[in-house]
Amino acid sequence: MANVTVTFTITEFCLHTGISEEELNEIVGLGVVEPSEIQETTWVFDDHAAIVVQRAVRLRHELALDWPGIAVALTLMDDIAHLKQENRLLRQRLSRFVAHP
């Protein structure tokens, strides 16, 4: 099965995610998303960036956070997800050595 990556120009990305170009510039500056390609005059974004921005927009509407707050919240949420995954793997390793009654 082939991997397919969808890419968006700035205009397409803004239309797809519902944000303005100014907001896109701000969230790129904050590191919320990064362009997958930087061409001479424009950025190109992949489908993963669109998912992250849609998640950020949802946080903005539901929690009334500003973009810097959203950047922090997304970072913390990603850290939590990684820690949960690491915890799950460590528990699996530990269960091999601990006798269950």
Curated annotation (Swiss-Prot):
Highest taxon of the lineage: Bacteria
Membrane-crossing segments per the record: none
Pfam families to which the protein is assigned, alphabetical: MerR_2
InterPro entries tied to this protein: CbpM
Family, as annotated: Belongs to the CbpM family.
NCBIfam families the record matches: PRK10265.1 (NF007617)
Role, per record: Interacts with CbpA and inhibits both the DnaJ-like co-chaperone activity and the DNA binding activity of CbpA. Together with CbpA, modulates the activity of the DnaK chaperone system. Does not inhibit the co-chaperone activity of DnaJ.
Protein name: Chaperone modulatory protein CbpM
Organism: Escherichia coli O1:K1 / APEC
Chain's gene name: cbpM
